[in-house]
């Protein structure tokens, strides 16, 4: 179903009760719990947020099939970069340490000398290195570059600049997504020996929630920001 699930007049508290995975997403916009009965629109007005942008982010997060490229291309580059920067910060500050903590307990509580555990540990380390390297590159090089192009072209949202042809690119698999999928797969298929099932679930649950978040981040990154930048580059030449 390609329809959005959340609309401006809905009570945000009801949406969050049904989809608690949205809590970190609304936190990135400065909206904290204690939502009362306020609608999405009212909360956006109170926080001086663009309701359209918040709703698009929420809906693309909840429904992988829903991805309104044309609409996303009308937002300003700075809005998109601000959101991607905040998701990066969330990975560094919360999600990576969270997986690491669960993984540490899980490994220490399992049978010593279990070969799968070493493999899981190594996979997580390479995933963490890749993700941190990408975030550093984003902060130092990629995002500032996107913003400088956007400033050159003035204050117009990219989608409205005359002559800006945005074509969505087909992309090869993202290494970060692939490493996470492998990590999950190793745990599901190859765990052996004696281990704590509850801790195992905690590790898998934290991996899955990061995976969902990164998939949305990547859709915005590759299908919106990258094509916007290519289009802006052509105009700046």
Question: What are the functions of these language-model segments?
Answer:
Residues 1-237:
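Small-residue-biased structural context
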